[in-house]
Amino acid sequence: MTLLVGLGNPTLRYAHTRHNVGFDILDSLVSGLNLSFTFSPKHNAHLCIYKDFILLKPQTYMNLSGESVLSTKNFYKPKELLIVHDDLDLPLGVVKFKNGGGNGGHNGLKSIDALCSNAYYRLRVGISKGTNATEHVLSKFNENEEPLKNAVFEHAKNALKFFIECNDFNAMCNHFTLKKPLAIET
């Protein structure tokens, strides 16, 4: 079993902000599979179980994401963990994968690292850097960024679908890494 976590903040206030990339991509994946999330008070998260995967959206706010992840890990005992999250250090349009390593200052990852360890897979979605990091991650994508954002979200969703089918992180990395921003037709 694999635990697949999309990071974000709950409530409409934060819906579709840069920090909610993980939520939005998992929502798109679940919707595309004609499934839905249900709220689990036990794990304080929205859950969806599909094949050998537990899809999770913590409802703890970003800085406490590790609480939901730890609770879910302890209950289901997954062999692998993959986190989908925004990354300020990557330009919008870039998707990279990582196995373990540092958290890059991402508070959701810091929480998971502190409670669970940093030995997990990551799907990193570039959101670019802003002048003020806090304001930037909590802002919505602007109108000019929307086409690229939508294309990148679709690409990331397809990467996760591929991972669910083959359960091979390295194969997903080889097929779906975007080192340069995705080129889209306008």
Curated annotation (Swiss-Prot):
<comment type="function">
    <text>Hydrolyzes ribosome-free peptidyl-tRNAs (with 1 or more amino acids incorporated), which drop off the ribosome during protein synthesis, or as a result of ribosome stalling.</text>
</comment>
<feature type="site" description="Discriminates between blocked and unblocked aminoacyl-tRNA">
    <location>
        <position position="9"/>
    </location>
</feature>
<comment type="similarity">
    <text>Belongs to the PTH family.</text>
</comment>
<feature type="binding site">
    <location>
        <position position="14"/>
    </location>
    <ligand>
        <name>tRNA</name>
    </ligand>
</feature>
<dbReference type="GO" id="GO:0006515">
    <property type="term" value="P:protein quality control for misfolded or incompletely synthesized proteins"/>
</dbReference>
<dbReference type="InterPro" id="IPR036416">
    <property type="entry name" value="Pept_tRNA_hydro_sf"/>
</dbReference>
<feature type="binding site">
    <location>
        <position position="107"/>
    </location>
    <ligand>
        <name>tRNA</name>
    </ligand>
</feature>
<keyword id="KW-0378">Hydrolase</keyword>
<dbReference type="GO" id="GO:0072344">
    <property type="term" value="P:rescue of stalled ribosome"/>
</dbReference>
<dbReference type="InterPro" id="IPR001328">
    <property type="entry name" value="Pept_tRNA_hydro"/>
</dbReference>
<keyword id="KW-0820">tRNA-binding</keyword>
<keyword id="KW-0694">RNA-binding</keyword>
<dbReference type="GO" id="GO:0005737">
    <property type="term" value="C:cytoplasm"/>
</dbReference>
<feature type="binding site">
    <location>
        <position position="61"/>
    </location>
    <ligand>
        <name>tRNA</name>
    </ligand>
</feature>
<keyword id="KW-0963">Cytoplasm</keyword>
<dbReference type="Pfam" id="PF01195">
    <property type="entry name" value="Pept_tRNA_hydro"/>
</dbReference>
<protein>
    <recommendedName>
        <fullName>Peptidyl-tRNA hydrolase</fullName>
        <ecNumber>3.1.1.29</ecNumber>
    </recommendedName>
</protein>
<dbReference type="InterPro" id="IPR018171">
    <property type="entry name" value="Pept_tRNA_hydro_CS"/>
</dbReference>
<dbReference type="GO" id="GO:0004045">
    <property type="term" value="F:peptidyl-tRNA hydrolase activity"/>
</dbReference>
<comment type="subunit">
    <text>Monomer.</text>
</comment>
<comment type="function">
    <text>Catalyzes the release of premature peptidyl moieties from peptidyl-tRNA molecules trapped in stalled 50S ribosomal subunits, and thus maintains levels of free tRNAs and 50S ribosomes.</text>
</comment>
<feature type="binding site">
    <location>
        <position position="63"/>
    </location>
    <ligand>
        <name>tRNA</name>
    </ligand>
</feature>
<feature type="site" description="Stabilizes the basic form of H active site to accept a proton">
    <location>
        <position position="86"/>
    </location>
</feature>
<dbReference type="GO" id="GO:0000049">
    <property type="term" value="F:tRNA binding"/>
</dbReference>
<feature type="active site" description="Proton acceptor">
    <location>
        <position position="19"/>
    </location>
</feature>
